Amino acid sequence: MPPSVSRALLLLAGLGCLLPGFLADEAQETAVSSHEQDHPACHRIAPSLAEFALSLYREVAHESNTTNIFFSPVSIALAFAMLSLGAKGDTHTQVLEGLKFNLTETAEAQIHDGFRHLLHTVNRPDSELQLAARNALVVHENLKLQHKFLEDAKNLYQSEAFLVDFRDPEQAKTKINSHVEKGTRGKIVDLVQELDARTLLALVNYVFFKGKWEKPFEPENTKEEDFHVNATTTVRVPMMSRLGRYDLFHCSTLASTVLRMDYKGNATALFLLPDEGKLQHLEDTLTTELITKFLAKSSLRSVTVHFPKLSISGTYDLKPLLGKLGITQVFSDNADLSGITEQEPLKASQALHKAVLTIDERGTEAAGATYMEIIPMSLPDSITLDRPFLFVIYSHEIKSPLFVGKVVDPTQH
């Protein structure tokens, strides 16, 4: 790399913590005006976020069909959209089009306003759904940033900024990792393994989620059972069990059974269990239109659900993945990030994303809390998620997928 081209390190940390989880104490209380609630700008960007989520999922899935997948498309999109504030020319266009925005149909101002409203919505303190998204700019102490970029990052993306000396990579790495670890309450540690001394700027984002099942499982019903990783591999997992009223239906287009489980606070988990031998078909055929249809479909019935307790994570180098979606120039020596600073030519040298998922029985924090519902005295349907399946965690408030994933082996952390 020519010495005239400095490095900008782009870091992204997405955390999904489902039962249990923690909401950062320092989360600022941000009110949403009634005007914004009447005109949810984040809904305008929702179709693009959903398309980006599935496109990125397919790129990740193509890399390996034997590992779990878990990432936050919202986290990744937030960080790159914020980066686009300082990008110009083809660099700028590639980033936004790579996030699946049609720039002839959606004005750039609407895109950023959509993300601004999304952040206001997810960071609301009055929601039963504990959800927070945070951005930070980690700036080399001698780097002077453009005033407009700093102001836009703060006003549109609620970004805070702090200074480090990247010439001391170990100290800078410790500060960044400590920031992420603190913000995710210890769920994401050591995000940055190596740091180049030529780094001038780091963008950090994390999304934090604590979901409470609307209908929690009882721990005493959890038993060790088989999970069939593939035709030759079976592992033992703690399998949760619950009889309740759920939306359950079979989709012939996907050759899959769809289970919808709701969280308190206007969020839903869609679990897609493919028919035997149809996992690849499901991954190739799933569309945003089908997800929207599943979320709207009502097929409530008595169902015995058998679901594996799990704690999985995903760590991704986004540079090659996003390159396949057309985002290449920002990582090259031809990057134009002069809207961030004119002091030094910048490029993004690295883009990291780490996400952590925990699913267990607990639906409330209060000891002894009980959920009761009336079950008709007919023979219930049953679904056992004992082989690889896909899932989408969806926020109805922002009409976008918060997290997307695949469980291949629940014992693989």
Curated annotation (Swiss-Prot):
Residues annotated as glycosylated: N65, N102, N230, N266
Cited Pfam families: Serpin
Family statement drawn from the similarity comment of this UniProt entry: Belongs to the serpin family.
Region (RCL): 368-387
Identification of the protein by name: Alpha-1-antiproteinase F
Main location: secreted
Tissues of expression: Plasma.
Protein keywords: Glycoprotein, Protease inhibitor, Secreted, Serine protease inhibitor, Signal
Disulfide bond found in the keyword field: no
Location of the protein in the cell: Secreted
Signal sequence coordinates: 1-24
Gene Ontology CC terms: extracellular space
Function: Inhibitor of serine proteases. The primary target is elastase, but also has a moderate affinity for plasmin and thrombin.
GO molecular function annotations of the record: serine-type endopeptidase inhibitor activity
SUPFAM superfamilies on file: Serpins (SSF56574)
Site, as annotated: Reactive bond: M377, S378
Domain comment quoted from the record: The reactive center loop (RCL) extends out from the body of the protein and directs binding to the target protease. The protease cleaves the serpin at the reactive site within the RCL, establishing a covalent linkage between the carboxyl group of the serpin reactive site and the serine hydroxyl of the protease. The resulting inactive serpin-protease complex is highly stable.
